[in-house]
Amino acid sequence: MKVLFTTDITEEPFTLTEIKEALKITGSAADDELERMITDARIYIEKAIDTSVTARTIQVTSLEKMEEWELPYGPTADLALTYGTDWEGALTYIYTYTGGVTTCPPEITRLITDYIKYKYDIDDEAIALPKSIKSQIQLLTRQP
């Protein structure tokens, strides 16, 4: 399965100022790193919960026929199915749809914020995710 974001999100679900406030950071020394962390955390959480935090156009090419709920980065809207062939001539299913919601739900914003706090506070990448973050991910993961 190949996933292509044909139009990606235009802005993150929250601002640098909001993250700095949540982390109780003053000054601008860490601004560049925090900006990167916002994007990295959003991408990580989107993959973990299989949900797009804001609406964007997605194209999925698959050798298998898929149900709407199986498509990544849902929820899905405006689904269109076309057919193609791969380089070996096999039939492919090409799904184009809007994935995600118009506004990032507050519980997902909180999860992303908690993840950024965790990443900002650790010095060792080998430390496992806290149970509280794992639990939130489990609760927010899209179900069939």
Each PLM stretch: what is its role?
Residues M1-P144:
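Divalent metal-cofactor coordination and adjacent catalytic microenvironments
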